[in-house]
Curated annotation (Swiss-Prot):
GO terms for biological process: anaphase-promoting complex-dependent catabolic process; cell division; positive regulation of mitotic metaphase/anaphase transition; protein branched polyubiquitination; protein K11-linked ubiquitination; protein K48-linked ubiquitination. SUPFAM superfamilies: TPR-like (SSF48452). Pathway: Protein modification; protein ubiquitination. The mammalian APC/C is composed at least of 14 distinct subunits ANAPC1, ANAPC2, CDC27/APC3, ANAPC4, ANAPC5, CDC16/APC6, ANAPC7, CDC23/APC8, ANAPC10, ANAPC11, CDC26/APC12, ANAPC13, ANAPC15 and ANAPC16 that assemble into a complex of at least 19 chains with a combined molecular mass of around 1.2 MDa; APC/C interacts with FZR1 and FBXO5. GO terms for molecular function: protein phosphatase binding. This is Anaphase-promoting complex subunit 5. It is found in: Nucleus; Cytoplasm, Cytoskeleton, Spindle. The gene is Anapc5. The keyword Ubl conjugation does not apply. One of its GO terms (cellular component) is anaphase-promoting complex. The modification Phosphothreonine is found at T217. The keyword Ubl conjugation does not apply. InterPro entries: Apc5, Apc5_dom, Apc5_N, TPR-like_helical_dom_sf.
């Protein structure tokens, strides 16, 4: 049979067949054997040996591309190969016959040039065997295809030489042409052999997992997969790669079709053998239903996902497959997150996992035991070189340290993950690992830099994220949400509430809970207290049902701030105490410190600054050690207010000392606010400093602070100076 210049017999009965490209590779091997050791240097021979494996295993490439690869390793040998192929293509059919006859001599003699069991020897034997099985008409078609292959290569070489002599603009066009040609090389090549197909599928799967930008485009990859499936429709792995490729473009119909075909082919080919006395097709059926449920869940088809899960549970119960049932229970929890009983499902999942010895979750333990469990799992991951699980574990620890309020440890874990070389990536020839773990770590890194006022560094991290995870990739939503949150915080710090309000829509589309919370923050900043209170109460009820403790505490703090800004600090105290109890119960140290900060502010408003100072001494250390720059400034500003309020009853000398200490703390707070460009708070600090300098009789310093206040007050007009109504 002849297809696209490729002569092959029974596709399933032979693993290799002769193509014009493989004839060119055979010429290269023959020339390497004929060339003496002195003619080729040791470095060039080493490069050629490294080049051979991808040439033997990879798909067919154009002749010009092959010339270029050989020339990079050994220019002298590239010239010999080019001359030899030219003589064969411009000669007669008997030259091709003679060439294959000469190949058999490579195995003869006491010291043959090639060993029969080596990689090169097996390739030569397969090619000789495949050529010997061809009929005369097939040999003639192969020779015609070789001539066409040579002519196309010569034409491409001439075009490249002409374009190299053009100017810079022409060079840009050449680069664009090269990209299109590379895609055509893959799509226009003939059917792949079994080894080539396996190599191609494993390579593209590794690229989709680790570095999607270097993989073929969705259209080119699908075209190549369709070409592969046309000659071998029962190739299950090709159907699965087609499923992954369709997920890239969010094609629900094609991805479902490919997924079902994958499990069908597993049953037909017998790839799923007997397991624990069960037939392989039963295992394929239940895991097919489970994967189908996961697919529908990804696209938001929750009703179809529940139906598929019910089918998977029914088959798993009939087969007594507890592992599959555990997976189904976990997916039931994912599907039920919008319901009030989701936490009950999670508890059942954990109990079932513990009962059957399947540690899928670790809950209900203290923070130190949680970290110990992660450490023990890391030991197993490193022992067995499970690089993907290592990455996930480090990303989890990064998120956990941030949740507990230890930004320094979170930063260390994120940098550790980014500096690691994945074992799987190196074995697959991929230089970077573009998994979800790396996206999470980079997003944490960007947010940590933004919290410290390093917006340029955060911007560089986000720029790298956008290049590493294009907008159409599956993990792009992570950096999109991170970017929107950083822009929102900067707009709020700068007093641009209208800009922050416009960003709420994008945040809501990516994370509904976060978007509603940010909307309430904007309404509160715009003094729309009634609307903000209604929104916060609805969000609080919803988060309490979902057991989202971190967001519950954040909402409680916003509700308390709303109360004291409405001149009701006594109502805010029970709310703050509830938030403090939750943060202490779940050991959220940073949120606990922030809650204590709010309690101290409430006590200041109630007229007990001495008690507020005592509370501040408990909370300020974690904030100064691991807190965001804005929170550090708020803490120092509050300390200054408490010092001034406490000094009202002091004698003149002691009062002057207290005011001097308050001024120093105000200067430190102003420096913190300046790092995040929070001009509204800088204005408040400048006003407060001017009043203190006036009380101390320092006219020059007072005038300077008054001038700064006036400039900022003109840029940020307001109805009054909010020194007491917000923290």
């Amino acid at each position: 049979m002849m297809t696209n210049g490729v002569v092959h017999a029974n596709l399933f009965g032979i693993k290799d067949w002769v193509t014009p490209y493989k004839i060119a590779v055979l010429v290269l091997l023959n020339e390497m054997g004929r060339t003496g050791e002195g003619a080729v240097s040791l470095v060039e021979r080493r490069k050629l040996n490294q080049l051979l494996l991808p040439l033997l295993q990879g798909p067919d490439i154009t002749l010009s591309k092959l010339y270029k690869l050989i020339e990079e390793s050994c220019p002298q040998l590239a010239n010999s190969v080019q001359i030899r192929i030219k003589l064969m293509a411009e000669g007669e059919l008997k030259d091709l016959e003679q060439f294959f006859d000469d190949l058999s001599d490579s195995f003869s003699g006491t010291e043959p040039e090639v060993h029969k069991t080596s990689v090169v020897g097996l390739f030569l034997r397969h090619m000789i065997l495949a050529y010997s099985k061809l009929s005369f008409s097939q040999v003639f078609k192969l020779y015609t295809a070789l001539q066409q292959y040579f002519q196309n290569g010569e034409k491409k070489t001439v075009e490249d030489a002409d374009m190299d002599r053009e100017d810079g603009e022409r060079q840009m066009e050449k680069e664009e042409l090269d990209v299109s040609v590379r895609e055509e090389e893959v799509s226009c090549s003939g059917p792949l052999s079994q080894k080539q197909a396996e190599f191609f599928l494993s390579q593209q799967a590794a690229l989709l997992k680790n570095d999607e930008t270097k993989a073929l485009t969705p259209a080119s990859l699908q075209k190549e997969l369709n070409n592969l499936l046309k000659f071998n429709p029962d190739f299950a792995e090709a159907h699965y790669l087609s499923y992954l490729n369709n997920l890239r473009v969010q094609d629900v119909f094609s991805s479902t079709h490919s997924l079902l075909h994958y499990f069908d082919r597993l049953i037909l080919t017998g790839a799923e053998g007997k397991s624990n006395g069960e037939e392989g097709y039963g295992r394929s059926l239940r895991y097919a239903a489970l994967n189908l449920a996961a697919l529908h869940c990804r696209f938001g088809h929750y009703q179809q996902a529940e139906l598929a899960l019910q089918e998977a549970i029914r088959i798993a119960q009939e087969s007594n497959d507890h592992v599959c049932l555990q997976h189904c229970l976990s997916w039931l929890y994912v599907l039920g997150q919008k319901r009030a009983d989701s936490y009950v499902l999670l508890e059942h999942s954990v109990k079932k996992a513990v009962h059957f010895g399947l540690p899928r979750a670790f809950a209900g333990k203290t923070a130190n035991k949680l970290m110990d469990a992660l450490k023990d799992s890391d030991l197993l991951h490193w022992k067995h070189s499970l690089s993907e699980l290592i990455d996930i574990s480090i990303a989890q620890k990064t998120a956990i340290w941030r949740l507990y309020g230890r930004s320094t440890m979170a930063l260390q874990q994120a940098q550790m993950l980014l500096s690691m070389n994945s074992l799987e990536s190196l074995s697959a020839g991929v230089q970077q690992n573009n998994t979800e773990s790396f996206a999470v770590a980079l997003c944490h890194l960007a947010e940590l830099h933004a919290e410290q006022g390093c917006f340029a560094a955060a911007g560089e991290v986000l720029k790298h994220l956008k290049e590493r995870f294009p907008p159409n990739s599956q993990h792009a939503q992570l950096w999109m949400l991170c970017d929107q949150k950083i822009q929102f915080d900067r707009a709020m710090n700068d007093g641009k509430f209208h800009l922050a309000d416009s960003l709420v829509t994008g945040i809501t589309a990516l994370n509904g809970i976060e978007g509603v919370y940010r909307k309430a923050v904007v309404l509160q900043a715009q003094n729309q207290m009634t609307e903000a209170h209604k929104l916060l109460q609805k969000l609080l009820t919803y988060c309490q049902k979902l057991k989202n403790t971190e967001m519950v505490i954040s909402v409680l703090l916003s509700v308390a701030e709303l109360y004291w800004r409405s001149s009701s600090p006594t109502i805010a105290m029970p709310v703050l105490l509830e938030a403090l109890a939750l943060s202490k119960e779940y050991r959220l140290q940073y949120l606990a410190s922030e809650t204590v900060l709010n309690l101290a502010y409430a006590q200041l408003i109630l007229g007990i600054p001495e008690q507020a100072l005592t509370l501040l001494h408990m909370a300020i250390e974690p904030i100064l050690a691991d807190g965001a720059i804005l929170d550090k400034g708020r803490a120092m500003f509050l300390v200054s207010k408490c010092q001034v309020a406490s000094a009202a009853s002091y004698d003149p000398v002691k009062k002057a000392e207290a005011l001097e200490a308050a001024i120093q703390n105000l200067t430190e707070a102003k420096n913190y606010f300046a790092k995040v460009d929070c001009r509204e708070r800088i204005r408040d600090v400048s006003y407060f400093q001017a009043r203190l300098y006036h009380a101390l009789g320092k006219t020059q310093e007072r005038n300077h602070c008054a001038m700064v206040f006036r400039q900022l007050h003109q840029e940020l007009p307001s109805h009054g100076v909010p020194l007491i109504n917000h923290l």
